[in-house]
C-alpha cells in the first residue's frame, strides 16, 4: 500500500524486538528508515536488512541525540516520523531497587523520549508537519509488581504525549502513544513456561501479541490515514485494559 512512501522515519531502539519489526514494516510501506540504536552490531544489521541508515545513538545523552538529528538532516533534509521506541528494564521491588537502577531506567525510558521528542519537534515545527509516536505500556494504566521505575517512565510517557499533542498540534505535528500488552519477544521467551501460561490466561483473546501487531499500529498512526488522530494512547493488548 506504500502508506509511508518516501517518509523519513527515525526509530530509536530499532535494532531488535518491536523496534526492529517496526523498521521492517515501515520499509515495506515505502519509508526511508533511520535506525537509532545504541548497540552498533544490531543497529547496523537492522539498517542493512531494511535498506536504511544506521546512526549509533545513546538516547539518554543530549549530545548523542543532537548528533542524531544533525546527521539525519544532513542526509535527508527533513524528519517526517519519530518512533520513540528505545527502552530498558531493571526490575526490583521498591525496597530492593537501588537508586542507580531507578535512574538508569528513567534516563533511557523517560529522559530519552524527552530528548528525542524535543529534537524532532524542533525540526518538525520548521517544516510545518510531522508525527511523533511514543512507546508506553499497558502497565502504565494498572501498575506491575517489581517495576516502580519502568511503570513510572511509561506513565510519564503518556503524560508527555498528551502535553505535546496540545502544544504541537498548531504546528501540524501529531503526537500519539502505543501501549503494548504481552508481546512475544526475546525477553519474554526467557521466562518460565508456568509464568508464561499464567500471564497468557489474563489476556481475553487468549494469546500474546506479536511484534507485528505493534508495528502495524505504529504504521497506521504514522501514516496520513491517521491524520485526525492526536493525543491518543492506543492499547495493543488483546483486551487486557478495557
Predicted regions and their residues:
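Conserved glycine-rich cofactor-binding loop
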Residues: 8, 15-17
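The beta1-alpha1 cofactor-binding region of Rossmann-like NAD(H)/NADP(H)-dependent oxidoreductases
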Residues: 40-41, 57-67, 99, 212-213
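Substrate-binding pocket helix/loop in short-chain dehydrogenase/reductase
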Residues: 93-94, 98-106, 188, 199
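C-terminal substrate-recognition "lid" of short-chain dehydrogenase/reductases
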Residues: 114, 129, 207-236, 241
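Active-site helix of classical SDR
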Residues: 117, 153, 161
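Alpha-helical segment proximal to the catalytic Tyr-Lys
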Residues: 122, 166-170, 227
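Residue(s) in the substrate-gating loop at a strand-loop-helix junction
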Residues: 137
